Amino acid sequence: MRYLATLLLSLAVLITAGCGWHLRDTTQVPSTMKVMILDSGDPNGPLSRAVRNQLRLNGVELLDKETTRKDVPSLRLGAVSISQDTASVFRNGQTAEYQMVMTVSASVLIPGRDIYPISTKVFRSFFDNPQMALAKDNEQEMIIKEMYDRAAEQLIRKLPSIRAADIRSDEEQTSTTTDTPATPARVSTTLGN
């Protein structure tokens, strides 16, 4: 029985390791993006701190924005908006629950290539208890901080797809340059009489 349990555990480990499964909160950042510049209008803001923390957790070395290196990809954080909509109401018509939506836009500039826009949305529910105003404010601040962390995780998770899009655009450019003939094809301008 002990050997069977060991065999099943070993098989489970091999299957999860072989299929590319990774632990949560770890992203395979492409090797070309292991050194990056983080550019933000508010470098000490909550989103910048959360993104900087996620990049460091994923083994990305961050360079100063004023660096002289121009061959390094740059993650530029854009606008952040937080909206709050009523999700449910009490019998008396007061708001009982809010749905908060955080929208974050950013772009990745790969030198000599292109600018790739990325965006993410994070949704959270927030219960509004009118009898506990102070606790409500503290809870809302905690939820917003958590939303910044989740948005940063989602932005970092999109970095491999940007690398894939960059490779795909390179392949398309090489195929269009090899497929075009050396002399332009003759185009008829008559209406086919």
UniProtKB/Swiss-Prot annotation:
Lipid anchor positions (N-palmitoyl cysteine): C19
Biased composition (Low complexity): 174-186
GO biological process: Gram-negative-bacterium-type cell outer membrane assembly; lipopolysaccharide transport
Residues with lipidation of kind S-diacylglycerol cysteine: C19
Span of the signal peptide: 1-18
Membrane topology: Lipid-anchor
Listed Pfam families: LptE (PF04390)
Annotated spans, Disordered: 166-193
GO molecular function, one term: lipopolysaccharide binding
Keyword annotations from UniProtKB, A to Z: Cell outer membrane, Lipoprotein, Membrane, Palmitate, Signal
A Gene Ontology term for the protein's cellular component: cell outer membrane
Compartment(s) of residence: Cell outer membrane
Bilayer-crossing regions: none
Subunit architecture: Component of the lipopolysaccharide transport and assembly complex. Interacts with LptD.
Function according to Swiss-Prot or TrEMBL: Together with LptD, is involved in the assembly of lipopolysaccharide (LPS) at the surface of the outer membrane. Required for the proper assembly of LptD. Binds LPS and may serve as the LPS recognition site at the outer membrane.
Similarity annotation: Belongs to the LptE lipoprotein family.
Protein name as it appears in the record: LPS-assembly lipoprotein LptE
Organism, scientific name: Escherichia coli O157:H7
Gene name, Swiss-Prot/TrEMBL: lptE
